[in-house]
Amino acid sequence: MRRSIDDYPFAEADLPSGADDVAHLSWAVAISDDYDDAEPRVVLTVEEVGRTGAGLAGHFTPDMARRLRLALHDALCEIGEPPGA
């Protein structure tokens, strides 16, 4: 099983002024159980715009995905933003 959950295509408007040296990245989140152990994992793919197929894909166990979620939650709090649900 593979299923796309969400993706975010890069937009020039996403960059703050003065961030000329920042990579233009798009990301996608999916789930997959196409492994020898058949355990479902969360797949996070990050690709530089214009380099389709050359991105990095992380295959996260549920515990690893929760740790990433917590890190994003904490980062949002650090910059004074509500972390959401």
Predicted regions and their residues:
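Positively charged, low-complexity terminal tracts
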Residues: 1-85
